[in-house]
Amino acid sequence: MTEVYAIYGASGCGRSLMPVAREHLARQNITAQIYFIDDSLTDSSQINGHTALNYQVFKALSAEKKFVLIGSANSQVRQKLANKLEKDQIELWSVQANNTIIMDAVDIAEGAALSPFVSITSNIKIGKCFHANLYSYVEHDCVIGDYVTFAPGVKCNGNIHIQDHAYIGSGAVIKQGTPD
């Protein structure tokens, strides 16, 4: 089966996720080219050794399945792009670094980007298109909504509920909540 993979967005967030995406595929023994999708392009170009093309060209690529990780820290943009991909029957792709730790009873929806040194402990539910940047963690019994972004170094302690579209800034410490 022919599969095509891409990161939607070739700016800072997308470029920082490309090495994670490459190691994610290598860990799964998948040999495939990964593209950047950049809607500002009229012609394809090279970015960090990967072909970058616009969405219309990507859609026209011949493949039985297409997978896209959305590389934008802006949650509203992620939601808009996720809706477009789903309408076009392109699957949201989740990636995680080799040293990401995911413990027991964790439910992470599609489209997640888990950067190096991220830890997700036990009994956690995470919504669609979650981004956890370098050195962030989510402790036990948390519920995280859709399109949430953790900037680098976020420390989310146990029993916390985070609503859709929240952006938690670098180095933030969210104190322990209480059980429901």
Residue positions per predicted region:
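Structural signal for interior beta-strand "rungs" in well-ordered beta-sheet cores
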Residues: V95-D180
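Glycine-rich adenosine-cofactor-binding loop
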Residues: E3-A21
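Short active-site oxyanion
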Residues: V4-A6, Q33, K65-L69
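Short hydrophobic segments within beta-strands
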Residues: I7-Y8, I37, G71, G169
